[in-house]
A protein has these predicted regions:
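Glycine-rich, phosphate-binding/catalytic loops in enzymes
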Residues: 81-83, 237-240, 319
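A general structural signal marking secondary-structure boundaries and capping sites
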Residues: 32-35, 133, 137-144, 163, ...
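Short proline/glycine- and basic residue-enriched helix-capping loop/turn segments at helix->loop/beta transitions
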Residues: 180-184
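Active-site activation/catalytic loop segments of kinase-like enzymes and analogous catalytic loops
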Residues: 233-276, 294-312
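Helical subdomain adjoining the active site within ATP-dependent kinase catalytic cores
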Residues: 169, 277-342
Length: 342
């Protein structure tokens, strides 16, 4: 098995399946020369809202191709993705990465199935998810600096305040503040003040990125496009926001209750550092949680605004951005209210 990372000068088509598979075979002829080209079987899984994902299999071995969507480099730092992925693979948190082509990556296959939203809401999974997040945060080293606010500012630079479509422009002007940069700065000041610890984070733990292996009963995470050092509590808060689902308009009434969130944080701390697990730490994390939920909502709201102008995928990013922005305001006000109350 070749393990050295390889680069291939091929573009995989997002529109033509035949052309896409021809290019994939050309790559596999070099990556897996022992495979018989005519016997390679392809299976498509695309569930992400930015990529095309499929597997190529020969005999019992499979590799995964991830083809990047058009214009996704505006919201995803591809160099960072490869660096983060290789670091995670080294520590046992990601499938091996075999190589890259002009518009995507080839990696190993993780056994298991992505969770469904009903499963993610099942309390039996909460502990396993909390445990895996804790293991990730405890295992992968970082320099202790987070990039989350820098990333938001980078997204903002990609956003044109003028939408080409008049209806979209009106919606944007009506539902979003003129100065989004000021919102980022406002949140950043409070987050820095919280002094929450930084860890290596996944930053995108929605249902499709959580894989459960029924045989080993283990939870694994996939898709490291947004993985970078961040506040550990951001990773948890962002995960909590995703119980609302991603298909169509998110339903935030489906998010975990206060008690469920408390239990999740309790499990997380128990698995991360049982010796220093105490009520004081629990209460501090719980107090700061709405602020970090607000931060995650703001991140994805701005991300979705950029996608609304650039993505070729049939998804209503503008309505999604609005749903996230409304939640940002709600969670932020909740945090401010609770701080002023004490």
């Amino acid at each position: 098995m070749a393990t050295e990372f390889q680069t291939f000068n091929e573009d995989l088509s997002l529109t033509s399946q035949t052309e896409c598979e021809d290019s994939a075979r050309a790559i596999l002829a070099k990556l897996r020369p022992e495979w018989t080209s005519s016997e390679i079987k392809f299976e498509y899984f695309s569930v992400g809202i930015t990529n095309k994902i499929f597997s190529a299999g020969f005999g019992t071995e499979h590799v995964i191709f991830r083809v990047f969507g058009h214009n996704t480099s505006k919201v995803i730092d591809r160099e960072n993705e490869v660096t983060a992925w290789r670091q995670l693979a080294k520590h046992g948190f990601a499938a091996p990465l075999y190589g890259k082509f002009n518009n995507g990556l080839i990696c190993g296959f993780l056994e298991g199935k992505s969770l469904k939203i009903e499963q993610m809401r099942d309390s039996r999974f909460h502990m396993n998810i909390a445990k895996r997040i804790a293991q990730l945060h405890a295992s992968v080293p970082t320099n202790g600096k987070t990039l989350v606010f820098e990333k938001m500012q980078e997204f903002l630079k990609q956003l044109d305040p003028k939408f080409e479509d008049a209806t979209k422009q009106e919606f944007f002007v009506t539902n979003f503040p003129q100065n989004l940069a000021a919102e980022i700065e406002k949140v950043e000041k409070l987050v820095i003040k919280s002094k929450e610890p930084v860890a290596f984070c996944h930053n995108d733990l929605l249902v499709h990125n959580i894989v459960f292996n029924g045989e080993t009963k283990r939870i694994e995470f996939i898709d490291y496009e947004y993985a970078f050092p961040n506040y550990a509590l951001y990773d948890i808060a962002n995960h909590f926001c995703e119980y609302a689902g991603v298909e169509g308009t998110p339903d935030y009434t489906k998010c975990l209750t206060k008690d469920e969130k408390w239990l999740f944080i309790n499990d997380y701390l128990h698995f991360k550092d049982s010796k220093n697990h105490c009520d004081v730490r629990m209460k501090a994390m719980y107090k700061h949680l709405p602020l970090f939920e607000a931060t995650a909502h703001l991140f994805w709201a701005i991300w979705a605004l950029v996608q609304a102008q650039n993505s070729t995928i049939d998804f209503d990013y503008l309505t999604y951005a609005h749903a996230r922005y409304e939640q940002y305001e709600k969670r932020f006000q909740k945090y401010i209210g609770s701080v002023n109350h004490h």
